[in-house]
Amino acid sequence: MGQQISDQTQLVINKLPEKVAKHVTLVRESGSLTYEEFLGRVAELNDVTAKIAAGQEKHLLFEVQPGSDSSAFWKVVVRVVCTKINKSSGIVEASRIMNLYQFIQLYKDITSQAAGVLAQSSTSEEPDGNPSSVTSCQASLWMGRVKQLTDEEECCICMDGRADLILPCAHSFCQKCIDKWSDRHRNCPICRLQMTGANESWVVSDAPTEDDMANYILNMADEAGQPHRP
């Protein structure tokens, strides 16, 4: 019976527009992800990116932000910090912070790309078989993808409008969608986190400065995807 429901769900997803189907798949995957699997994926990204960028000047480091995974609702508040480091100098050149949804998107992008790169390098005639020769600065390209994911925040409901409202759980919505939802509900449409008062229910993102954003992130009330300052 369970398998039948799962098959029917997948059939419905397959009929959705590609962008919406991708969003639904990512939400389902994040919902079933265990904490151990999550940590495994963080470690896997570190291994994969290190292998692909071997011999290059820069590399990426993925870390769970300390304290962000200690809650029973870790999927809502956990943050993954992605840092680009110059190997020779040890200088941190860029750092971004992602929520779980953004991290899963990046994980899929990088592992999919890495599989192709490693397959290509295995058939290469180069004697060292160094996959880093495929792309001269892979870390910078990946960091660009992280920036894209964290800058282009969309409404979690319609996946079309620009998110201009953020809840304390860090899920973002456009004004039109959240107005319809909040008429009858006092919780987040995505994670169902209850809002205890009107003053915390719907927080308007009002083009804050970088300093405002940094402080907002540290207070765990900001949306993911803003520049992270270690």
Curated annotation (Swiss-Prot):
* Cystine pairings recorded for this chain: none
- Top-level taxon of origin: Eukaryota
Per its UniProt record, what InterPro entries does this chain match? RING-HC_RNF141, RNF141-like, Znf_RING, Znf_RING/FYVE/PHD, Znf_RING_CS
* Location in the cell: Membrane
Q: Where is it found, in Gene Ontology cellular component terms?
A: membrane
Zinc finger spans (RING-type) are: 155-192
Lipoprotein is among the record's keywords: yes
Q: Name one GO molecular function term.
A: zinc ion binding
- Lipidation sites, kind N-myristoyl glycine, are 2
A Pfam family matched in the record = zf-RING_2
Please give the biological process terms from Gene Ontology that the record holds.
Answer: protein autoubiquitination; regulation of DNA-templated transcription
Membrane topology term reads: Lipid-anchor
Q: Which UniProt keywords apply?
A: Lipoprotein, Membrane, Metal-binding, Myristate, Zinc, Zinc-finger
Role noted for this protein: May be involved in spermatogenesis.
Q: What is this protein called?
A: RING finger protein 141
What is the native source organism of this protein?
A: Rattus norvegicus
Q: Which gene encodes it?
A: Rnf141
